[in-house]
Amino acid sequence: MFDVIVIGGGHAGVEASAAAARMGKKTLLLTTLIEQIGAASCNPAIGGLAKGHLVKELDAMGGLMGEITDEAGIQFRILNESKGVAVQGSRAQIDMDKYRIIARNKLLKLPNLEISQEQASVLIVENDEVKGVKTNLENIYFAKKVILTTGTFLNGLIHVGENKLQAGRVGELASVNLGNYLQTLGLKMGRLKTGTCPRVDAKSIDFSVLEIQDGDVNPKAFSFRSRNFNPTQLPCYIARTNTTTHEIIKNNFYRAPLFTGQIEGVGPRYCPSIEDKINRFSDKESHHLFIEPQTIDATEYYINGFSTSLPYEVQTQMLRSVEGFENAKITRFGYAIEYDYIEPTELKHTLELKKIKNLYCAGQINGTTGYEEAAAQGFMAGINASLSIDMKEPLILRRDEAYIGVLIDDLVVKGTKEPYRMFTSRAEFRLLLREENAILRLGKYGYDLGLLSEQDFTYIQNIANNLQKGLEFLLSKEFTPNNQNNAFLESLGEDKISSIVNLQKIVARASFDIEKLKKLDPIFETMDHYSLREILNEAKYYHYISMQKAQVEKMKNLSELKIPENFDFKSVSGLSNEVVEKLNHHKPPTIFAASQISGITPAALDILQIYIKMQKKKA
């Protein structure tokens, strides 16, 4: 008997199994190929806009993705660096081979984790409660909790031109039996599609005509636990399609599975295939392609922006029309893949299914796209499954606490009919959810769960103390416009003042940086760089942050008003049939969650609030 069984060894499965095992749960990870644990099936990169936030949040609570990325990274960049700190995002190119080897070895070393190379065929479910798993090897494993992290494997179907192949990924069998079995459980399910780009032999690329894109001169680590971070960095390159490329693609629309009706699943809106881009943006004469090394050896390059399911010979023809690729040799062709997913409104915020007790889902099975979104869900599913075994309160991150909270709340409350990816625009309180304050927001959770060490948490507490001390000093200390103070400001390269101001307003100036902060007062001289950066950020955005915190307090009042788990919405007089139907379907855990459901009116929320408060008084 296991405590937790995790089905699938992708990014969600890695985090789910690691979290459960590290929380002391006897855990089994079932995966089709042990060599492919943690494989980056698509692009060789981790992070990006909003996705970097997810990785930093994972790391803040003790997840693995940030550390693995730092070890396997071959280029590091901060995206949107010229914009505000709320929308900046960390991104790393990774050595794909090294990444999965590190991920696999980290799991194999965990004391409470067993890994078995076999495929789950059927779940053992009794009275709407999962009891275990039966595999393709006829093995039966019983468990208190099961977590599905199946990625694109559920009835996976690969498309290249007119050709179709049942597979979960190239070279790996689709999970047909499990996919068919899930259809019998009465769950709302759908079909989604994603795709991948061709890979090209480096010897066949003329890099001399391509634009170079280097990593940052002073790269920043993803993990706050990474020490002596000094990675070897490789350049990426930028190429461009042209009218000839577009003409080749247009002439073969009739062979594109996307347009022939061969593909039924809905594809990702924000990561379209090249044929979809040419069709949707027919007025554009060129599209950027990002040429990314797959490993530190740089023998193969991933052609980011060139996702396609056109026939093999067409892929070669259209790629060779791009400058620098006239002699390109494709080592691995692009393809589209369709797969089953469970509509995420079937889930609770813990990622447990509402209809099947003790069965959790994480990653692409929930309708998301992206390694980072998958990892975040896997981590939370592993944590909540473990907490449930211990009969402890679940960890449900609020929208004002973490992008992970936004991600899960969006999925569970709003659902999705297309592959969901994270954006900073999805977060109402993104100024509070900066990448670099993730450890301050979430570190205590990781420590309380036993996923962060005493040393790690002490480091976080020191930064929190420095931030509080530094900010209080800036807000309380006033500068008068005398000769001495103005001379000091001029020595820093800052404009003089003409009226009394507190130091926070001076530090909030766009020109004020960390080096100037150090000279402002001896209190800052001994503080570490991380603390100084956060003091600077909090000071610069102080009034905006204060406004967002006030908004959060209003939201908390609604979030704290809990709706009982088996609440009968029909018993509330004054609610329309439509509202009752939606509330019964979504089963919101709080009034705030109910407010996020489309079609739930303010009047209905008022009625519901009054009724629940009255019931609580009676109780």
From Swiss-Prot:
For this record, the Gene Ontology CC terms, alphabetical, are: cytosol
KW Transport (keyword) present: no
SUPFAM superfamilies from the xrefs? FAD/NAD(P)-binding domain (SSF51905)
Residues bound to FAD are G8, G9, G10, H11, A12, G13
Q: Which GO terms describe its molecular function?
A: flavin adenine dinucleotide binding
Q: What are the UniProt keywords, alphabetically?
A: Cytoplasm, FAD, Flavoprotein, NAD, tRNA processing
Q: Which residues bind NAD(+)?
A: 267-281
Please, one GO biological process term?
tRNA wobble uridine modification
> PROSITE patterns per the record?
GIDA_1 (PS01280), GIDA_2 (PS01281)
Cellular compartments annotated: Cytoplasm
Q: Which Pfam families does this one have?
A: GIDA, GIDA_C_1st, SAM_GIDA_C
The prosthetic group or cofactor this protein requires is: FAD
Q: Which residues form a coiled coil?
A: none
Q: Name the domain of life this protein comes from.
A: Bacteria
Q: What does this protein do?
A: NAD-binding protein involved in the addition of a carboxymethylaminomethyl (cmnm) group at the wobble position (U34) of certain tRNAs, forming tRNA-cmnm(5)s(2)U34.
What family is reported? Belongs to the MnmG family.
Q: How does it assemble?
A: Homodimer. Heterotetramer of two MnmE and two MnmG subunits.
Q: What is this protein called?
A: tRNA uridine 5-carboxymethylaminomethyl modification enzyme MnmG
